[in-house]
Amino acid sequence: MPAADTVTFWNDVYLSRPAATNPQPNVRLTEIAAHLPAGDALDLGCGNGGDALWLAGQGWRVTATDVSTVAVERLATLAGARGLADRVVAVQCELSSSFPPGKFDLISAQYLHTPLDLDRAPILRSAAQALRPQGRMLVVDHGSVAPWSWNQDPSIRFPSPQEVAEDIGLDSSTWTVERADVSRRVATGPDGSTAEVADHVLIIRRTA
């Protein structure tokens, strides 16, 4: 799909929903990043901005990207309203064709899924290369189908964290896998219903 069509698709998704006034951060990000010293963070696919705002509130300097111009404009507005405009830079970016410049201590890809065609491996490889030494990339993927999931096909197969790491194909002399596992939690859907879901958690650290 052409980049312009991808932008239009995701803009339509966000415009079909009321703008979030108090977006919440993802659970896996908070439980992991809470133990890291604040530095420069990159949020890939920032969506409503809950992760970027939480990180900024913890002292991080955040570059937050999304393909949707609506999403990044809404995040910039929220950051300004919370007095975090100096800590959050919201950038519209089509990651399949470009990548934000800079080096980062934390790169977060939370549920970077799409119903459109997207080859994630090169994106995550570029992300790993943008880490500073001792920086970490946190990739959290869906590991199960929730009642509110886009795809309700019960036969869908979710790649394991180990398979995602292998697909990225990083040199073990420069990067190491710190964590690759499945964690379960009770999640709340857009309609307020709850269900147990599985998260596939991958943490890659740059060692050199």
Segments the model singles out, each with a brief description of its role:
Residues 1-36, 145:
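Conserved class I S-adenosyl-L-methionine
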Residues 42, 48-95:
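Class I SAM-dependent methyltransferase SAM/SAH-binding core
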Residues 114-127:
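A short, conserved alpha-helix within the catalytic core of class I
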Residues 188-208:
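Core SAM-dependent methyltransferase catalytic element
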Residues 157-174, 179-180:
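Short alpha-helix
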Residues 134-142:
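Conserved beta-strand signature within the Rossmann-like core of class I S-adenosyl-L-methionine
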Residues 114, 142-147:
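Short "lid" loop at the C-terminus of a central beta-strand within the Rossmann-like core
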Residues 99-106:
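A short acidic, Gly/Pro-enriched loop at the edge of an enzyme's catalytic core
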